[in-house]
UniProtKB/Swiss-Prot annotation:
Binds 1 copper ion per subunit. Transmembrane segments: none annotated. PROSITE patterns: COPPER_BLUE (PS00196), MULTICOPPER_OXIDASE1 (PS00079). It comes from the Bacteria. Cu cation binds at residues 117, 170, 175, 180. NCBIfam families: rusti_cyanin. This is Rusticyanin.
Length: 187
């Protein structure tokens, strides 16, 4: 008889196997887009300085932005956070509230030394399949390189949203299915 813990363990094994298979046949890159050559490298002190540039204010599990130009800084799997997840202002997968009509400058940092990640924006909400098909409206970052040599990868993009509800999602197989996504409310 399966217990809840056994079923959960089997589910994670299945997700992991699917992700490994997808990576083996090249589907991980296909799901997240092509390897983006705009990625740059940063040291840990540089990453810490970038994280400080986020212009949002935290209230509970929400980060609220104001003004005509906002700067969102999201990181993939900072130390002390569960894998896989995004962190903004030391919050795991927070809801981001952004004013309609604002220019949104996004910096996405991959600090996870074991995996590449993506930060894509879509209208499709959860739940997400192991192999997500989300039709991103902003294929934000492409597929990140895996950090190496004591450095981390980061990239920037700009988004001009209209009012509505969106989601930021990692399209690497298995990541969104296990919780690597968050909500964006533009109003």
């Amino acid at each position: 008889m399966y217990t809840q813990n056994t079923m959960k363990k089997n589910w994670y094994v299945t997700v992991g196997a699917a992700a490994a298979l997808a990576a083996t046949v090249g589907m991980g890159t296909a799901m997240a887009g092509t390897l983006d050559t705009t990625w740059k490298e940063a040291t840990l002190p540089q990453v810490k300085a970038m994280l400080e540039k986020d212009t949002g204010k935290v209230s509970g599990d929400t980060v609220t932005y104001s003004g005509k130009t906002v700067h969102v800084v999201a990181a993939a799997v900072l130390p002390g956070f569960p894998f896989p997840s995004f962190e903004v202002h030391d919050k795991k997968n927070p809801t981001l509230e952004i004013p309609a009509g604002a220019t949104v400058d996004v910096t996405f940092i991959n600090t996870n030394k074991g995996f590449g990640h993506s930060f894509d924006i879509t209208k499709k909400g959860p739940p997400y399949a192991v192999m997500p098909v989300i039709d991103p409206i902003v294929a934000g970052t492409g597929f990140s390189p895996v950090p190496k040599d004591g450095k981390f990868g980061y990239t920037d993009f700009t988004w001009h949203p209209t009012a509505g509800t969106y989601y930021y999602v990692c399209q690497i197989p298995g990541h969104a299915a296990t919780g690597m996504f968050g909500k964006i409310v533009v109003k």
